[in-house]
């Protein structure tokens, strides 16, 4: 049966890309996975097409569990991701697919399953293609990257980020929040990936050169376009947090 995966799709105002996004998740040639789709109170028509596609797949015998919901108010990606991961099945592997992006091909989960066949692998990050330029971006993580404080180094833990649920759950909730106790409104990737990478260390991490993800740069409301200052200030706060200690076991 293979490892169990949960594809988590946090979405907001992405109606132009719903079909491509959701279809890339549904078309995986793999049986043991769930899909969780969260529309964060989009004012556009994101939810309707997503709900229709996912409900149709369910009715046609999709092998896993499908959850699709629309928030009554905007919670932000960080809150949605945190709550959804904690509600996911135990022993699942989380695959975060942003609502305006898509998986690169139908064998992404099969590829990841081979990597996670080793219990020693707790997390991965990978390579992606930029839409529309076609540029391929790959992680550049040398042995030296793991020495010292990685939060002070260049950001390397980008798409596609995957990890075991149990690893994520070891990150303190307060580290996903500002001093007022509110979830970060931007920069959730760094808030997630740095702590779990610190706990994993190189022995429990795998960087992937295979392109598994398409990163869509056509979205005019992406955080780096409309919330750049908040993104930069939040990143600095996260960089300055105390690193997590490396774990010997999950």
Describe each PLM feature range.
Residues 1-250:
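Nucleotide-sugar donor-binding/catalytic module of glycosyltransferases
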């Amino acid at each position: 049966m293979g490892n169990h995966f949960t594809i988590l799709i946090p979405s907001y105002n992405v109606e132009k890309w719903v079909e491509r996004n959701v279809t890339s998740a549904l078309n995986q040639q793999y049986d043991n996975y769930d899909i969780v789709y969260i529309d964060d109170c989009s004012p556009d028509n994101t939810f309707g097409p997503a709900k229709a596609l996912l409900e149709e797949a369910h009715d046609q015998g999709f092998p896993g569990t499908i959850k699709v919901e629309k928030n009554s108010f905007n919670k932000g990606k960080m809150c949605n991701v945190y709550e959804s991961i904690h509600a996911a099945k135990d022993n699942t592997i989380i695959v975060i697919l942003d609502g305006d992006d898509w998986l690169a091909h139908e064998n992404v989960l099969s590829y990841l399953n081979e990597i996670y066949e080793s219990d020693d692998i707790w997390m991965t990050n990978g390579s992606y293609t930029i839409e529309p330029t076609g540029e391929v971006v790959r992680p550049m993580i040398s042995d030296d990257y793991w020495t010292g404080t990685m939060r002070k180094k260049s950001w390397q833990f980008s798409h596609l980020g995957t990890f075991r649920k149990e690893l994520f759950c070891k990150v303190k909730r307060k580290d996903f929040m500002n001093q007022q106790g509110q979830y970060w409104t931007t920069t959730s990737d760094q808030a997630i990936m740095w702590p779990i990478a610190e706990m994993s260390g190189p022995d429990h991490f795998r960087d992937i050169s295979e392109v598994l993800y398409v990163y869509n740069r056509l979205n005019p409301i992406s955080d780096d376009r409309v919330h750049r200052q908040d993104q930069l200030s939040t990143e600095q706060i996260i960089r300055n947090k105390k690193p997590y200690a490396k774990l010997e076991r999950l």
